[in-house]
């Protein structure tokens, strides 16, 4: 944490094909070792697969999937009197989308299809329908928060 001033947020440029900032952020999340062109190819390939499979606008599917996967609450560990409690806290909007993107990436990685573009396309389609690995992760996080609701008075 800086002592002098608040560090400004970096502005992310929208992606070249769709002009969407969320898609550009997702590409940055997917990117490994600074290879943005590879991440771009994966995302656009996944969007092509979505267009062929669902006959819908890929951006629409992407935003629906993101909306479905975004968590509302999560748990944070808090130490009180020698015991650790999992305290449910609300997730701020920027972290919501960051978590959703990470979960989509991880769920896509674990899938069995041949190419990453296919895996990502299928994961996005499933997430848009409310199923899949990323949705499972979200439900798990929500379940944890629900189970530890009794400790919500230990606010941060």
Swiss-Prot record:
It comes from the Bacteria. One of its GO terms (molecular function) is tRNA binding. GO terms for biological process: translation. Keywords: Ribonucleoprotein, Ribosomal protein, RNA-binding, rRNA-binding, tRNA-binding. The keyword Acyltransferase does not apply. One of its GO terms (cellular component) is small ribosomal subunit. InterPro entries: Ribosomal_uS7, Ribosomal_uS7_bac/org-type, Ribosomal_uS7_CS, Ribosomal_uS7_dom, Ribosomal_uS7_dom_sf. One of the primary rRNA binding proteins, it binds directly to 16S rRNA where it nucleates assembly of the head domain of the 30S subunit. Is located at the subunit interface close to the decoding center, probably blocks exit of the E-site tRNA. Belongs to the universal ribosomal protein uS7 family. Part of the 30S ribosomal subunit. Contacts proteins S9 and S11. This is Small ribosomal subunit protein uS7. It comes from Polynucleobacter necessarius subsp. necessarius (strain STIR1). The lineage of its organism: Bacteria, Pseudomonadati, Pseudomonadota, Betaproteobacteria, Burkholderiales.
